[in-house]
Amino acid sequence: MGRFPRALKRELGMGQPPQVAAVCYRANGSSVEFLLVNTSSGKWTFPKGRLEAALSASESAAAEAWEEAGARGTIEGEPFGFYLDTKRSLGVSETVREIIIAAYLMDVHSAVVPQESGRNPSWFAPQEAKRRLGESRASKYSETLHKIVDAATQRISNAPSIAYPSKQHSMAHLR
């Protein structure tokens, strides 16, 4: 189930593939931090983007983490949640549409300066990440992002010390 299920896309009324996000985290002592990046409009978000044809959904999310945040690590093979956001489409007239994003948890092992400039990747504790993600967003969208941070924090705190290899992908082959 690495690709977004077509039946779910139809059920949600989505005519095009959804976006995928890498919810990047690192352990910082007994706490956890999340890696956020800036959008072109200055909002904070998780590294995200469209599905890439040659990659699975989780690999596409990991590729976004690399391109936007310079992060490499181990990403889970299945989404742990979904959230809503908006996407601006520029053309003859500017339109804003709602999109559903599949969220993949990624344990970051290393981070360097990203390929994309202007992203300003930064680490935040869960409460600060929620505050930053909520800035300049309607409450409907900030609430879904807050739930993703809460779900990720809960999942990380309950994770066994040994990963599930069949459910995770190493990013070594995407270098």
List the model feature ranges, each with a label:
Residues M1-G29:
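Acidic, metal-coordinating catalytic segment for phosphate/diphosphate chemistry
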Residues N28-E33, V92-V96:
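Short, solvent-exposed loop/turn segments that connect beta-strands within catalytic domains
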Residues L35-N38:
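Short, acidic/hydrophobic/Gly-rich beta-strand patch recurrent on exposed beta strands
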Residues T45-G49:
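A short gly/proline-enriched turn/hairpin at secondary-structure junctions
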Residues L51-Y141, H173-R175:
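Unchanged
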Residues S136-R175:
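Charged phosphate-binding loop/patch that engages nucleotide di/tri-phosphates or the phosphate backbone
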